[in-house]
A protein has these predicted regions:
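Binuclear metal-dependent phosphoesterase catalytic core
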Residues: 38, 145-147, 151-153, 244-251, ...
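Extended active-site neighborhood of metal-dependent phosphoesterases/phosphodiesterases
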Residues: 86-199, 297-301
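Acidic/histidine-rich helix-loop elements
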Residues: 36-54, 76-83, 109, 115, ...
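N-terminal active-site segment of His-dependent metallophosphoesterases
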Residues: 22-87, 91
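His/acidic metal-ligating clusters that form di-metal
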Residues: 65-67, 158-161, 173-266
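Active-site environment of divalent metal-dependent phosphoester hydrolases
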Residues: 44-46, 77-80, 101-112, 167-170, ...
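Bacterial Sec-dependent N-terminal signal peptides
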Residues: 1-23
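Metal-dependent catalytic neighborhoods of phosphoester/phosphodiester hydrolases
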Residues: 48-49, 73-91, 108-126, 219, ...
Length: 333
């Protein structure tokens, strides 16, 4: 394939990457864009053990007043599934807050496929997902542009959402699934498209997904890497490293990744100039839990490769409020 045809394909892929819901995300006039991440709610509709989850969501939304909400997997893990999603998303829909979803390894285990879950999530008002272009059983792999406050037709930042699947499908390899080759290729195409469109400068970007990359463990184990927050369990990444972190570093747009999956980890650590962060467990007693539930907040800053982030807990406590990269200069060995 010659170079001209390759650019045409990349540009077309970029056009298709725009969300189809009609929602358009834009930096506010003060140059900020705030995201609330909820993760691992393990919500079971009608189960009293999930009641605290339903207290958390409106408290955080009303206190933080975000521009967007992202749910990063293992959100509804009991029947009836559709009614569970209705209950969770009602809080953001009633407040007219755009939201996106990435699925975890448990969401599809209640007799509903990932594709069926994606279908009804995309049908919700204010949802900005769309069906993934990528096959291999992954759904809602999306890139979502955030447009400029003064240039509303120009992308100013990007939000990537990835489906990290569930469990290994390769015989002899145990544990959790990994980013596929097609997902990585798709990410590189999207990143290149927006970099070319931005006069060959990578846009500031964040990536949200459920299962941590193997680099999380490497990053935290290296004491020279500055970190904030707690690690109360060993990370549970896939056993195989398919190379997504390398591609993010090489493409140069992603500043940070935000995951869930490991319920009692809430740290953020600098690894080779990319922040690797956990959200805050947002569920309650339907699974193993930390002492209190909460959410992670991120505030992007227009025109800058930096962001603020903190944890907002059910009781209103704010923890680990930091700025990346300013607060993450690595220690000397």
């Amino acid at each position: 394939m010659d170079m001209d045809k390759r650019w045409i394909i990349i540009l077309l892929l970029g056009l298709f990457s725009l969300n189809m819901s009609g929602q358009k995300l834009t930096f506010k006039k003060d140059g900020t864009f705030k995201i609330v991440q909820f993760t691992d709610m393990h919500y079971k509709h009608g189960n009293p053990k999930s009641d605290t989850t339903l207290l958390l969501i409106p408290r955080v939304l009303d206190a933080e007043k975000p521009d967007m909400v992202i749910f990063t997997g293992d959100i509804v893990t009991g029947k009836p599934v559709k009614e569970g999603w209705d209950a969770i998303t009602k809080f953001v829909i009633d407040r007219k807050i755009p939201f996106a979803v990435t699925l975890g390894n448990h969401d599809h285990e209640q007799g509903v496929t990932r594709e069926e879950i994606a279908d009804f999530i995309i049908s919700y008002p204010f949802n900005i997902n769309r069906q993934s272009e990528i096959s291999q059983g992954r759904v809602m792999d999306n890139v979502i542009p955030v447009y400029g406050s003064e240039k509303p037709l120009k992308e100013a930042a990007l939000l990537y959402c990835f489906d990290t699947g569930a469990y290994s499908t390769i015989e002899g390899v145990s544990g959790y699934d990994w980013m596929t080759t097609k997902q990585i290729e798709w990410y590189r195409e999207q990143s290149l498209h927006y970099t070319i469109k931005n006069n060959h400068h990578p846009l500031p970007a964040l990536a949200y997904f459920h299962i941590a990359l193997p680099e999380y463990r490497l990053a935290f184990n290296d004491e020279k890497n500055v970190r904030y927050g707690e690690r109360k369990e060993n990370e549970c990444p896939p056993e195989l490293n398919s190379g997504m972190f390398f591609s993010m570093k090489e493409m140069g747009d992603v500043m940070a990744t935000f995951v869930g999956h490991d319920h009692v980890n809430d740290y953020i650590v600098n690894y080779h100039g990319i922040a690797l962060a956990f959200g805050h467990f947002s569920g309650w007693k339907t699974t193993y839990t930390p002492e209190i539930n909460g959410a992670r907040i991120v505030v992007l800053k227009e025109g800058k490769r930096e962001f603020d982030t903190w944890l907002h807990q059910l009781d209103g406590t704010i923890k680990y409020k930091v700025t990346f990269p300013a607060d993450f200069a690595n220690r000397d060995k």
